[in-house]
């Protein structure tokens, strides 16, 4: 115990540098030599002699030789014997300096479980545990410092993130996820812009505004807008007209009676069933042109088809009246579609059962009840049958099928004259 050491100088009466006296019963204290890199002692301490017998209870002596810059662990006592209770103090004795007390501690029943360092007035605790919690007092002269310390247990995950560098794993994962999401958003935006650009380019391209239709053999010649229409035949003109109107999304209002439309459709179906199927496929490929250049391919040449149209119209003529004048054949005026008198009756026509397997689908003997011949007008590139009006004499056979016709208000009233001569049927647009 160095605190019990008294005068360590070896005088002539206490001893010499050669060693202890032979009569001494106590071991001598050791000398501490500090060596530098040149393997020479930095200083030569004087020999330390044992204190008087009465001043020591027990003396343990050790000889230590260390190199310059080494770390020393000086143990007070021989392991594993530890002081469990009582005061502990360390005092440094230098031959050329006065004695200095390094550390004074009073140990309790439970020794501290962590390392403690004293650096001047500072107490250093390394690897603090829960047992280190409590109140610490520091006495320095007349000043007393009281410190209350509370130790909180840190979660294992948080400890792993901070002490083991585990925070790098979630940080890198988060950065990678943000990068992937950003790349995906940029890719979708670029793809959307490219799709819109292709659509805009396709819509503005004049070569792609119309369908490329391959013409059937013998039905027309190809062009950039589709097929050039051939002249209508007697059996397919009406069906083709109706299909053109359906393909263009328009609705052609029929100004003739129902018998004429039904008989024409029946006659077309019975005479040329294969032609109607071909024309139906052909009609679906047409599209209405936006310019006048495209519409000229759909024009009807009235001069070339005049003979054929005359044949079609021959079955619709009324034998009682003569042919219309040249003024009536030129064109249709708007007056033909207006109702001059809402009270006048609409002409009545008699239908024929065209679905019956017996008999003809067209009865020429009853043509007196139908309206006049058809004339063909060209409107927006579409050919349709424009009926001409003929006088109609009501008879007793008209009342038999009165429920099958429209606008049977007053069939017996007189009809106004057409163009100053003959009779004119009044049409209702209702």
Swiss-Prot record:
Segments on the Cytoplasmic side according to the record's topology features: 191-430
Keyword Transcription regulation among UniProt keywords: no
Keyword Transmembrane: yes
Cystines in this chain: 10-49
Transmembrane segment boundaries: 169-190
Membrane topology: Single-pass type I membrane protein
GO cellular component: external side of plasma membrane; membrane raft; plasma membrane
Modified residues (Phosphoserine): 104
Subcellular location: Cell membrane; Membrane raft
Processing after translation: Phosphorylated on tyrosine following B-cell activation. Phosphorylated on tyrosine residues by LYN. Tyrosine residues are phosphorylated sequentially after activation of the B cell receptor. Phosphorylation of Tyr-405 is extremely rapid.
Residue ranges of domain Ig-like C2-type in the record: 1-17, 52-152
InterPro entries hit by this protein: CD19, Ig-like_dom, Ig-like_dom_sf, Ig_sub
Biased composition, class Acidic residues, residue ranges: 278-299, 327-344, 401-415
Comp. bias regions, Polar residues: 15-32, 216-227, 303-313
GO terms for biological process, alphabetical: antigen receptor-mediated signaling pathway; B cell mediated immunity; B cell proliferation involved in immune response; B cell receptor signaling pathway; B-1 B cell differentiation; immunoglobulin mediated immune response; positive regulation of phosphatidylinositol 3-kinase/protein kinase B signal transduction; positive regulation of release of sequestered calcium ion into cytosol
Disordered, as annotated region: 1-56, 206-241, 255-374, 387-430
Entry function: Functions as a coreceptor for the B-cell antigen receptor complex (BCR) on B-lymphocytes. Decreases the threshold for activation of downstream signaling pathways and for triggering B-cell responses to antigens. Activates signaling pathways that lead to the activation of phosphatidylinositol 3-kinase and the mobilization of intracellular Ca(2+) stores. Is not required for early steps during B cell differentiation in the blood marrow. Required for normal differentiation of B-1 cells. Required for normal B cell differentiation and proliferation in response to antigen challenges.
UniProt name for this protein: B-lymphocyte antigen CD19
Organism: Cavia porcellus
Gene from which this protein is expressed: CD19
